[in-house]
Amino acid sequence: MAYPTISGPYGLVPVNLIGGRAFVGSTRMVPIRSGYSEHISLGDVVQIDTATGTLVRSAVGTPGATQAVVNGTLGVFLGCEYSSSTGPIYGKNRYQNWAANTVAADAIAYVADDPQQVFKAVALTNTGSASNKVQAAFGQIFLGSNLELVTNYTSNTLAAPTSGNSSGGLCAGSSNAKVTAAAPFRVVGFVNETALSVTTSIPSTVTNATQTPASMTGIYPGMQVSGSGITTPVYVQTVTSSTFTVNSSFTSAAGTNYTFTGAQEVLVAWNFGHHSYANGTGV
């Protein structure tokens, strides 16, 4: 088995702080309203509710060309605590996630609220939906670009995820294009240990953004392409079972190998203004 395997998105995981400073586990404790009716999982982005001043999961919009600021965005959920009146352990218990409609008057969430926090997350395609776990792999060309949040929330009509983990991930813009406009996160690095690289040939000489390689196995949106005829870096935007389309046309050389590289996991930081501590608008 390849090591390590990325089986799906897992939310945002704190790694360190901008500048390489250590993350030592510091969190802010924020109340959750008793009976709050939505699931919150480990790694979900959370915000302050304008009506109650308590913690709720983020109301960020569906991924598109851009993704707007959500006032009150506080950080990432890292668990919670509240008292149980039914046991098995009485008094304050600690939980990895908040199950919708839990009744607990003393519920407190742990939030990674540092606006300079760096997170690790899984790369996803942009399908125009907030419920999407389709894999992407971002090439070096995405460094410094912006990414949008794919929440993949679990409906409160369903049981809370048994793992307690988020299914959120990050995607590029519409049609998987690089984003330079408004979006919550900035790419600051890549996780090399889980990066992908695949080589395949293109049988025919074609001048086009859409090419038909000998094999599409292992080729994902976001991958950077290198090989004959490519003088300016290009990256894959869309894939089908037999073709890939890049952001800029090139002339392929028949029978020549092309290499596709990309990271399944990226390192990101908050963009200025998207975290409430760096936004002058209050809640």
Per-segment meaning from a language model:
Residues 70, 114, 142, 178-181, ...:
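A generic structural signal for short, non-catalytic loop/turn and secondary-structure boundary residues
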Residues 11-20:
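Short, positively charged
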Residues 1-10, 175-196, 261-283:
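Protruding loop/beta-arch "assembly-hinge" segments enriched in small, turn-prone residues
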Residues 2-6, 19, 23-140, 145-156:
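A sequence-level detector for low-complexity, Ser/Thr- and acidic-rich stretches
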Residues 82-115, 196-283:
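Small/polar beta-strand repeat architecture
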Residues 44-70, 149-177, 214-243, 251:
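Ser/Thr/Gly-rich low-complexity blocks that favor extended beta-strand/coil architectures
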